[in-house]
Amino acid sequence: MRAELAVYFIAGTQDIVRGTLPGVLEEALKAGITCFQYREKGAGSLQTASERKEMALECQQLCAKYQVPFIINDDVALALEIGADGIHVGQNDEEIRQVIASCAGKMKIGLSVHSVSEAEEAERLGAVDYIGVGPIFPTISKADAEPVSGTAILEEIRRAGIKLPIVGIGGINETNSAEVLTAGADGVSVISAITRSDDCYSVIKQLKNPGYPS
């Protein structure tokens, strides 16, 4: 799982400023993302279940073509219906124990955490496959984001002995990703660093190899 978290792209239709979500996703897949999470939330997102399912299936097919895990954010029913590779939930989304009961053994389970205690609880549950930690830096992609924690939270979680794979989230881009990895994350998750880029190939190469020339 750790290798799959290296460059973890998150997006929904609400994040796309040029082109379409499938178009942006395929470019990102060609450039080398290692995981994709379909997150359809907030202003500008698809509103009906049928629209979300249709988009999820199109994105899932693209991920399968490039052999990259396809994860759905906070929609267990849809993830189970289409056979997603994983489900990701936040602290205020579907109750994690219910998610585990429905999904354990069928797909990977990811959980967002914002503190050492939440990370410790995720590890105690025994069925969480990885944790998303943040927001590390200020973000424009999530209106209801938690307070910024900085990279220190990653160091604190690792010092506490948490062994779960960690992906950092929140305001991460090709200029600061090295800090996130140095602090203890196994990978970085990005939204706008890819969706708002004119050259996602270069961005993704730099995210995968922080020393890669820009």
UniProtKB/Swiss-Prot annotation:
This is Thiamine-phosphate synthase. GO terms for biological process: thiamine biosynthetic process; thiamine diphosphate biosynthetic process. One of its GO terms (cellular component) is cytoplasm. Its EC number is 2.5.1.3. CDD domains: TMP_TenI. Pathway: Cofactor biosynthesis; thiamine diphosphate biosynthesis; thiamine phosphate from 4-amino-2-methyl-5-diphosphomethylpyrimidine and 4-methyl-5-(2-phosphoethyl)-thiazole: step 1/1. 2-[(2R,5Z)-2-carboxy-4-methylthiazol-5(2H)-ylidene]ethyl phosphate binds at T139, I140, S141, G171, I191, S192. Belongs to the thiamine-phosphate synthase family. Condenses 4-methyl-5-(beta-hydroxyethyl)thiazole monophosphate (THZ-P) and 2-methyl-4-amino-5-hydroxymethyl pyrimidine pyrophosphate (HMP-PP) to form thiamine monophosphate (TMP). InterPro entries: Aldolase_TIM (IPR013785), ThiamineP_synth_sf (IPR036206), ThiamineP_synth_TenI (IPR022998), TMP_synthase (IPR034291). 4-amino-2-methyl-5-(diphosphooxymethyl)pyrimidine binds at Q37, Y38, R39, E40, K41, N73, S112, K142. It catalyses: 2-[(2R,5Z)-2-carboxy-4-methylthiazol-5(2H)-ylidene]ethyl phosphate + 4-amino-2-methyl-5-(diphosphooxymethyl)pyrimidine + 2 H(+) = thiamine phosphate + CO2 + diphosphate; 2-(2-carboxy-4-methylthiazol-5-yl)ethyl phosphate + 4-amino-2-methyl-5-(diphosphooxymethyl)pyrimidine + 2 H(+) = thiamine phosphate + CO2 + diphosphate; 4-methyl-5-(2-phosphooxyethyl)-thiazole + 4-amino-2-methyl-5-(diphosphooxymethyl)pyrimidine + H(+) = thiamine phosphate + diphosphate. Keywords: Magnesium, Metal-binding, Thiamine biosynthesis, Transferase. PANTHER family: THIAMINE-PHOSPHATE PYROPHOSPHORYLASE, THIAMINE-PHOSPHATE SYNTHASE. Pfam families: TMP-TENI (PF02581). GO terms for molecular function: magnesium ion binding; thiamine-phosphate diphosphorylase activity. Its cofactor is Mg(2+). Mg(2+) binds at D74, D93. The keyword Magnesium applies. Binds 1 Mg(2+) ion per subunit.
